[in-house]
């Protein structure tokens, strides 16, 4: 982002701000969804983020690179407010993790692999919702959004060393939680498989008896 554009936004130029929106809206929206696990809430967070950014435009430094880290920091704070006011977050995270799964072609090995990948992704997203908020924020900014440690630190208002330590803890906890969640999902599938087998045996037996 050029210094001229920063200056224009600081001065309240609506065209420059509209350009900023076009450049960063999708990134802000995706970031909000990863933090809230709710598409509708993510839309609200995105809107509130840009409203807050406009209100705080005078705080933009004249020199610097992209304003994306600044916007993601605002979005993180807006998402925190939502998290504090919404105690149903974890249920939403679990629902979002399994929603919108696309159908795949019926090719045995490929389908089995994709189903397992889907389960792992769902388990990871559910585990993400179980992380402590500070750990989740750092993980989303650094791993999903791809911010450098320094940019993530500025976005969150914390030291770079804190970003590093939180990210290290978050990675370890996410890995363990995801494995536990994946194992739980697999255990839940077992009774269903037994029921399918039982229903099949019942139908075949009934058909055989009917032919006697």
How would you label these PLM feature ranges?
Residues 1-27, 204-212:
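N-terminal module of bacterial RNA polymerase sigma factors
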Residues 2, 81, 89-120, 192-204:
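Internal acidic/polar
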Residues 8, 95, 154-155, 172-212:
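C-terminal edge and immediately downstream basic/flexible tail or linker adjoining helix-turn-helix-like DNA-binding
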Residues 8-19, 29-48, 59-63:
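Short, charged helix-capping/linker segments at alpha-helix termini
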Residues 38, 148, 157-162:
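Helix-turn-helix DNA-binding motif, specifically the short coil turn and the N-cap/start of the second
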Residues 44-51, 55, 65-77:
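Structural recognition of an alpha-helix C-terminal capping motif at a helix-to-coil junction
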Residues 138-142:
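A short pre-motif secondary-structure segment
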